[in-house]
Amino acid sequence: MKFLTASDVVEIHDLVISENELQGMAGDKSLDAVLARIENRMSFGMINDTYDLAACYACFLAVGHVFNEANKRTAFACMDVCLSLNDVALVYDHDEVGSLVIKAAQGIVDEIELSAWLRYMAQQ
C-alpha cells in the first residue's frame, strides 16, 4: 500500500484551503502524532487494505484538527488521494461523504464504519 507523508498532507491542505482562511498548523496539535496513529494501527495489523487506510486518514485527520482551518476538507481530500494512489477509483455523492467526514470529526462515525462504507461504494 502507498501512504501519505506529512509533506503530502500539508500540500493537500494547502490546495483545499481558501486564501481568506487562517493558514497553517494549529499550535497545540501534531500532524506527526496523527500519522503515528495510522502507522501504529498498521504495525498491529489493524489496517488490512486500502479502504482501512483511507478511512484512517479521513477520521484521524478530521478528529485531530491539526490545521487552523479546513481540517474536514483536508481529511476528505487525503482519503480520496490515498484511494487514488492505491488504484481505487470510487464515485460517490459528495454530500454523503461530506456528511460522513463531519460525523467522523464529531466522533459519531469511526474509521471502521467509514472503511465499511468505502468498501460498499466500491461494489456499486
Indicate where each model-derived feature is located:
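FIC/Doc superfamily catalytic core
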Residues: 1-124
